[in-house]
Amino acid sequence: MLLLGLLLLTALAGARLLWNKWKYRSLHLPPLAPGFLHLLQPDLPIYLLGLTQKLGPVYRLRLGLQDVVVLNSKRTIEEALIRRWVDFAGRPQMPSYKLVSQHYQDLSLGDYSLLWKAHKKLTRSALLLGIRNSMEPLVEQLTQEFCERMRAQAGTPVAIQKEFSFLTCSVICCLTFGDKEDTLVHAFHDCVEDLMKSWEHWSIQVLDIVPFLRFFPNPGLRRLKQALENRDRIVEKQLRQHKDSMVAGQWRDMTDYMLQGMGKPKVEKGHGRLLEGHVHMSVVDLFIGGTETTATTLSWAVAFLLHHPEIQQRLQEELDCELGPGASGSRVPLKDPSRLPLLTATIAEVLRLRPVVPLALPHRTTRHSSILGYDIPEGTVVIPNLQGAHLDDTVWEQPHEFRPDRFLVPGASPRVLAFGCGARVCLGEPLARLELFVVLARLLHAFTLLPPTGPLPSLRPRSHCGINLTMQPFQVRLQPRGAVAPGPSQHQ
């Protein structure tokens, strides 16, 4: 049976390749990279950038039964996602996407349509209008509580990634459900962690490339389905509680706002309507997109500052000048980040070097289009290599070096693309930037970051085979400002 399946798969692949070659014979397509095992490269975004030396910034890769187009420069990414955004606003329909998104009722994974636009409008309104007044004070409050917990562990090695993860999960729980109770935060944190681990497993990645394999036994697929059942059970419980207790015309949090606003974004007749399932998946998007991503960026920032204590010292001097010396209660200047220019530049540099979703999520062309004179047929899967664009030495001077000062001169450096751009830009970008700004300001104002005994944390990402650019686990010691620093022997 297995042999028969493999023979059939080979025959289908050959037929598909011959059909595509005949179908697109008159088009000027991007050059095709030789080989078909590209996804096995340990540092995929850097590998894809390296292919530009021979192929240019736009080329094709063969993945399974289809070719995908890779965009490796800021110019090509912005041309596709901003200037020709309608052409490139689609999402490919892959087996794991269908499972994770409840049949594409999801903003991140759903295909472009009038219903998708209405869904996006509702979720964006909930973020920007429904909780606008509570977002900043909430992030400030939870960050202060986080710093107090860290003060209780002062001087001892702390697994800062895990602490950041619980902090960002608490923020999302409060904004989405109006609740930061530890049991709920831990339940959602563990749920998201389990889901992402299952989704990024190699067996699911292979399934997306060769969908035919879903007909064969797959323990990884079974684990993913179990993680999704657990996710949906937790979210549905919260939705029931909100429906039973909410008051019409009032909203306590984003869930209230979205449940009451489902019918407000008008969708043309015949294009469907927003249902509770769309609210369900908006909640899922907020947790997946707003927990580990922000926590990982904060962790990268700490790791870079451990390697560059001179930058940390300059940041603390800037914070002392603006907020006063020591861990004072002065408010972080959220309305005018330019008052902390080095902090703003440091965040931009971390996002440039380590965009958490380095290959974004794949796009799909909704109609025939073109990039740099190359034809891009309708239905083509397109991968924006965000990290590759950030490391392009024709755009950035010494692109692999951590140099926040490059962003201190207005207009001297391009805008980073870490949150994507165009119609598919991350809706949570304002919240993520707020958290990065407040947490790093408070953390560096209250503590000096010191390495534990032993080597500094690795700045090399883990081998990239999933969605997020993760880092090696590490620990940090948080020395309260003004306290006596440890001796030199402890700074090895």
From Swiss-Prot:
Keyword Oxidoreductase listed:
yes
What InterPro entries does its record include?
Cyt_P450 (IPR001128), Cyt_P450_CS (IPR017972), Cyt_P450_E_grp-I (IPR002401), Cyt_P450_sf (IPR036396)
Q: Which GO terms describe its molecular function?
A: 17-hydroxyprogesterone 21-hydroxylase activity; heme binding; iron ion binding; progesterone 21-hydroxylase activity; steroid 21-monooxygenase activity; steroid binding; steroid hydroxylase activity
Q: Which reaction does it catalyse?
A: 17alpha-hydroxyprogesterone + reduced [NADPH--hemoprotein reductase] + O2 = 11-deoxycortisol + oxidized [NADPH--hemoprotein reductase] + H2O + H(+); progesterone + reduced [NADPH--hemoprotein reductase] + O2 = 21-hydroxyprogesterone + oxidized [NADPH--hemoprotein reductase] + H2O + H(+)
Where is this protein localized, as stated in its record? Answer: Endoplasmic reticulum membrane; Microsome membrane
State a single Pfam family of this protein: p450
EC supergroup of this enzyme: oxidoreductase
Q: Any idea what job this protein has?
A: Specifically catalyzes the 21-hydroxylation of steroids. Required for the adrenal synthesis of mineralocorticoids and glucocorticoids.
According to its UniProt record, which protein family does this protein belong to?
Belongs to the cytochrome P450 family.
Q: What is the name attached to this protein's record?
A: Steroid 21-hydroxylase
